[in-house]
Amino acid sequence: MRTCSLHQLHVVTYENGMKLQQKLVEMRQREELDDQLLLLEHPPVITLGRGGDAKNLLASPEALEAEHVRFFETTRGGDITYHGPGQVVGYPILHLGEGRRDVRKYVTMLEEVLIRTVAEYGITAERAEGKRGIWVGNDKIAAIGVRIAKWVTSHGWALNVNTNLEHFRLITPCGLHGTGVTSIARELGRAVPMDEVRTILAAKFAEIFERELVPRPETLRLVKVLVHDGDRVLLLHRKPERGHFWQPITGTIDDGESPLQTARRELVEETGNRGEVEELGLTQSFMIESQYLESRYPAPIIASEVLYSAHLDARAPVVIDPAEHDDYGWFTFAEAYEKIRWTDDREAFERLQQAQHAALAVMTTT
């Protein structure tokens, strides 16, 4: 039985998900690794496939920004769809070798994975003639869109588990008028543990594709600490030989250390200050290019990062680590968005802003 590496990822920005897929596809085409299966969640995002019609996006750019939903045109097949928290997105990177080069059969097998998964919850889902995806009556519960390059697959499925279905009002799902959307939670009338659904999906995938799934842990476990004074955020500038970019405080979790302990340690080591560190309820996964780690790890380098915040008076002296950084600065959120390079940093700062707005709303009503 062929092996397939299973990556159980956290929240992955859409851009980072595309970069990771591209890297894995290229490596699989060169036969530098075995088949891969990525299971993850995306932040709120609307994507338009190669065969899609932009008219199926019903919201203006201003409306999308107000909802904190991004929009991308992508390389997969299919029309328009929504990804967001509470969805299990699956990206199989498989080599369809001799005897398996049947695109229709491949899509049918993906559909079967989803049909059998929701059946575990007593939900009867079906294929629908002339429609993409998996359906419960007239409501879509899962979307499918794939890409195949040199007989290596990418993209895949999005299964609605505990998804905020209100965001689907921003689009005409898959360009189909008169149809609705649903989720496992909606069908059952209760939320469902995401890890439980992931486990079932992986088992059904292994069964249908006849693969031995081999769990692959992340290469690095990190923390990110967003230091702020309420209105501005602190960024550190990495030295040219260390990447030459602006970033929040970031550090590796040492053996025997909890993420919170790492966050507190990094705050002291990177700024010379102590402060109250709070978790922001977000863990992200992303790929790190080997040049930023001096090729210490074999590709692909996949990291997970737990997000924290810390309040610091901007008048306090900041003592940076000269081995890593050559400058620092306090910036408004708008200025920080212009300076940071990585989409996961942007997602982190948006989460901090949302937490600040929520705290302000509580103070206003009490």
Stretches found by the model and what they are:
Residues R216-V233, T252-D255:
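Conserved N-terminal beta-strand and adjoining loop/helix that marks the start
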Residues H177-T179, L307-S309, V318-E350:
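NUDIX/MutT-family hydrolases
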Residues E41, N160, V227, L307-H311:
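Short, well-ordered beta-strand micro-motif
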Residues T199-K204, I208-P217, E338-T366:
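Charged phosphate-binding loop/patch that engages nucleotide di/tri-phosphates or the phosphate backbone
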Residues M1-W135, K140-I141, A191-V192:
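N-terminal lobe of the biotin/lipoate ligase/transferase fold
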Residues R104, R232-R274, T366:
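Conserved Nudix-box catalytic region and its N-terminal flanking loop in Nudix hydrolases
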